Amino acid sequence: MKKLHLGCWHRDFPDFINVDLLDMPHIHYKSNINELPFFGNSEIDLIYCSHAFEYFDLVEAKDVLKEWKRVLKTNGVLRLAVPNFEALVEIYKRTNNINKVLGPLYGRMEINEGKNTLFHKT
């Protein structure tokens, strides 16, 4: 089974091919996750992407999903994890602290590749 972990950052799962923009020892392909030219059509059984998809805007997201579909086998699985809006509302109601929810909703992540900063597009 061929499994991809897209936008893996520091997480290294056994038996996954890791793709991320950052250069870390466990990264197999240092690349953006919106284009996967190093994989052929219908080559991948499983794509896992946790808290990276929200960095694409609506137009980009459509193209990204097309690309991921291209590399997935016909019965392949796409597993996405994105911010849980309902959970964030509950946190706000419980704490009354807007700063606890702004990061996950409109967060930013600075990366060590030049002057790059990634912002959520949600």
Which residue stretches match the model-derived regions?
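A general structural motif
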Residues: 1, 44, 73-75
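A short beta-strand submotif of the Rossmann-like class I SAM-dependent methyltransferase core
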Residues: 46-52, 61
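Conserved Rossmann-like nucleotide-binding pocket used by diverse enzymes
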Residues: 17, 29, 48, 78-81
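Class I SAM-dependent methyltransferase SAM/SAH-binding core
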Residues: 2-37, 86
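A short acidic, Gly/Pro-enriched loop at the edge of an enzyme's catalytic core
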Residues: 34-47
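S-adenosyl-L-methionine-dependent methyltransferase catalytic module, highlighting the catalytic core
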Residues: 60-73, 77-122
